[in-house]
Amino acid sequence: MQKKTLSDITIQGKRVLMRVDFNVPLDEEKNITDDKRIVEALPSIKKIIENGGRLILMSHLGRPKGKPNQDFSLTPAAERLSELLDCPVIMAGDCIGTEVMQQVLALQDGEVIMLENLRFHPEEEANDPDFAKELASLGEIYVNDAFGTAHRAHASTEGITRYVQTAVAGYLIEKELMYLGKALQEPERPFVAILGGSKISGKIDVLENLFNKVDTVLIGGAMVFTFFKAQGLGTGNSLVEENKLELALSLIEQAARKNIKLLLPQDIIIAPEISADAESMAVAVNAIPDGMIGVDIGPETRAAYRQEILGARTVLWNGPMGVFEIDRFAEGTIAIAEAMADATAAGATTIIGGGDSAAAVAKAGLADQITHISTGGGASLEFLEGKELPGIAALND
């Protein structure tokens, strides 16, 4: 997917309208608890400012349901960006309208304005053409650097590209496409994928697409119990998707047919309930007692999965191995994170597909030891499913 990027255009004196993903978590006092998404947009932002562009930033934050709500204002993001850049960032009162247009036209080279939350208008998520056109009129060049929303055809990501001549990718999207794209198109082998999370249903398309690309798949998280039950094993009170048992068997058969090594856990950590003070122990997967719940992969599985990861040249991970929100049941997930960091040090390319896995790696303090951590949970999943992302497809080739 070769798309034009920021590096391909001249910016000097131009109004550059950039879609960023500043959907950051806020606490009750409206303080940003994690500014990772703002920091990740800095390379594109700095490039535009340093090259004399007039930068207009737009983003959504949370789910304000199509009407103005100060709880979802982007003011904290503008303030944090101003600190990071050490220069003023003007905060607009809206994202469209006469007043905003006047503020935008008054910008000088190298100045920055942050538009208010796009989702204060229902037209954003409806991909309304008039709204998209009004947004487009603010800039002369459009840049999309919001990978996290690239799988959504919204006014600011897809509709807008019909009303601008120049629509290019920012550095963050370029990096995402480079790592995720290379992993799917021409990975160094062996290529190992690790999939976790609670449900098979959310990962079917990913699994089926990866079966055409990878050498080995390691499965963890609660979705293993649907596989176990399908194979006739007892699963106690663990989470099982009863309507996905046949599907689980067909996935096992597909893997065998395509000569893919599909590994399921050999042992499981079980507890009577999912709580931090529950008694827990490791048991073999064919010995899960009635009434017990599987909460993590066991030590033998951790060791086996580690070996597979260390033997790989490309590793892709999406989804935790257990209930990692509880420290005692996070050991399996942390073990995967550590194995990935060690594989990276040994020269492998390691990629984390956003969401919970990214949070787990951050929790383990290993984020800087992974080749690439995707910024888009849903977007990276759809990319791994082999789907075209509308926000990227719409950019200039």
Curated annotation (Swiss-Prot):
Record EC number: 2.7.2.3
Entry's localization field: Cytoplasm
Keyword Transferase annotated: yes
InterPro entries found in the cross-reference section: Phosphoglycerate_kinase (IPR001576), Phosphoglycerate_kinase_CS (IPR015911), Phosphoglycerate_kinase_N (IPR015824), Phosphoglycerate_kinase_sf (IPR036043)
Transmembrane feature ranges: none
Reactions that this protein is recorded to catalyse: (2R)-3-phosphoglycerate + ATP = (2R)-3-phospho-glyceroyl phosphate + ADP
PANTHER family with a match to the protein in the record: PHOSPHOGLYCERATE KINASE, PHOSPHOGLYCERATE KINASE 1, CHLOROPLASTIC-RELATED
Name the UniProt record assigns to this protein: Phosphoglycerate kinase
